[in-house]
């Protein structure tokens, strides 16, 4: 879920050097293209106390119109087994049965993200446990279980009950968050690794076909993932899930490079990403992902199509199906009106290999200066290279602003004539470069 907004794309930033080798594309080439695109889908409302099974029907009907292959839903363990172990709440089960059943009938599979520790299992301090009430959200729910086996039993139950109707079971939500909202307490990597190992073993015993998704990471610097590798998690998951909201493609690439450096070939599941259509009425917590409704639609389509040629990305799941009172990440407004993003994502999931928006470039004279200006596809760093007399004289690394545009003044030392400029996105590489001369 969006929090601690990741490195925004609200300003264009340029870092210049004199010369360096050009970067190659970091997506897949056409020869590497998988037979089918990643499992495209959308996040939907999951299991929490009081949710109506009818909500499941409406969400799956919308997901089907999106051509979604998967939906991702949070499943709160504290709602599933609120009072004691192995005592599954009947109302909770009615919702999950309805969601999984409706999805299966529509040809859609479900990713369950299982988090939120029940009071009886929580490792929270006594001061928090005293105020922990079953079926109510409290700070104690964010603390991991005292015994990982209790969590493992719950996810094994889900694997046994739903089996092949699940796309996967994601082990917790965002344990590397710097806040204490989802995974509280000390020694996070150590405790998460213990939960993951117990969960993987139990799920595979219940149904070996059910995928186990580890990580649920928000950080792309690799620190938490390296800490997990040091605690022996390799071999205890089928996919590594990540949640990247800013510089989505660059973040996916960065975490994949950490995987490769550690001999990890499991695919990435980008099962939470998106943009909020809150501009210009910005909300503080959404500032760095805040765009217009039109840009939200464009970004989602471009991201899906950029990722579709990447064999090591198994899924791309947009956050979220519908706006809430606090967030505008949805494809559908809180009123029920479809936003432009709904149609854009539907077309992208139907035609995932269509080309993303191209890089554009114009060289403009502004007094005694030359300015490079244009636009590009969202998600990664951009590179500008300026040549004089066929020699590379200037390079700028930058990111697009919230409207996917850029303006880069060229250094005056380059002069104002016989300049050739090339701009490209790292992910797409030189094949997608825009060229201009002046």
Annotate the PLM regions:
Residues 1-11:
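Bacterial N-terminal signal peptides that target proteins for export
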Residues 128-131, 175, 280, 295, ...:
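Aromatic-rich peripheral "rim/lid" segments of glycoside hydrolase catalytic domains that contact
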Residues 55-78, 106-113:
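Catalytic domains of carbohydrate-active enzymes, especially glycoside hydrolases
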Residues 51-55, 81-95, 122-239, 244-264, ...:
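Active-site cleft segment of glycoside hydrolase catalytic domains centered on the general acid/base Glu
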């Amino acid at each position: 879920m969006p929090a601690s907004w990741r490195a925004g794309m609200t300003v264009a930033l340029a870092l210049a050097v004199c010369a360096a080798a050009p970067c190659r594309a970091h997506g897949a080439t056409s020869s590497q293209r998988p037979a089918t695109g990643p499992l495209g889908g959308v996040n939907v409302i999951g299991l929490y106390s009081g949710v109506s099974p009818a909500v499941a029907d409406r969400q799956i009907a919308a997901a089907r119109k999106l051509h979604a292959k998967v939906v991702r839903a949070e499943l709160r363990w504290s709602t599933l087994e609120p009072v004691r172990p192995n005592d599954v709440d009947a109302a909770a089960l009615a919702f999950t049965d309805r969601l999984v059943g409706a999805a299966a009938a529509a040809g859609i599979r479900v990713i369950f993200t299982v988090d939120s520790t029940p009071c009886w299992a929580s490792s929270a301090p006594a001061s928090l446990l005293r105020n922990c009430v079953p079926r109510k959200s409290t700070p104690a729910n964010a603390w991991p279980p005292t015994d990982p086996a209790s969590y493992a039993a719950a996810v094994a139950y889900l694997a046994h009950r739903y089996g092949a109707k699940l796309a996967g079971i994601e082990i917790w939500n965002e344990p590397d968050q710097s806040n204490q909202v989802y995974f509280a307490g000390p020694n996070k990597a150590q405790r998460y690794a213990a939960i993951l190992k117990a969960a993987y073993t139990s799920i595979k015993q219940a149904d070996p076909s059910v995928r186990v998704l580890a990580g649920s990471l928000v950080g792309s610097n690799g620190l938490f993932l390296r800490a997990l590798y040091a605690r022996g998690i390799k071999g205890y998951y089928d996919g590594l899930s990540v949640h990247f909201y800013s510089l989505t493609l660059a973040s996916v690439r960065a975490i994949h490079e950490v995987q490769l450096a550690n001999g990890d070939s499991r695919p990435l599941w980008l099962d939470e990403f998106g943009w909020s259509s809150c501009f210009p009425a910005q909300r503080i917590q959404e500032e760095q992902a805040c765009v217009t409704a039109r840009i939200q639609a464009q970004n989602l389509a471009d991201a899906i199509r950029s990722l579709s040629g990447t064999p090591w990305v198994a899924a791309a799941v947009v956050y979220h199906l519908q706006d809430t009172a606090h967030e505008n990440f949805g494809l559908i407004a809180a009123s029920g009106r479809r936003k432009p993003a709904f149609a854009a994502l539907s077309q992208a999931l139907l035609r995932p290999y269509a080309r993303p928006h191209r890089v554009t470039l114009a060289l403009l004279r502004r007094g005694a200066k030359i300015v490079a200006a244009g636009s590009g596809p969202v998600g990664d760093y951009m590179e500008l290279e300026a040549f004089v007399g066929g020699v590379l004289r200037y390079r700028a690394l930058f990111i697009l602003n919230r409207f996917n545009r850029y303006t880069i003044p060229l250094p005056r030392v380059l002069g104002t004539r016989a300049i050739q400029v090339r701009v490209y996105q790292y992910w797409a590489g030189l094949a997608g470069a825009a060229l201009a001369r002046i």
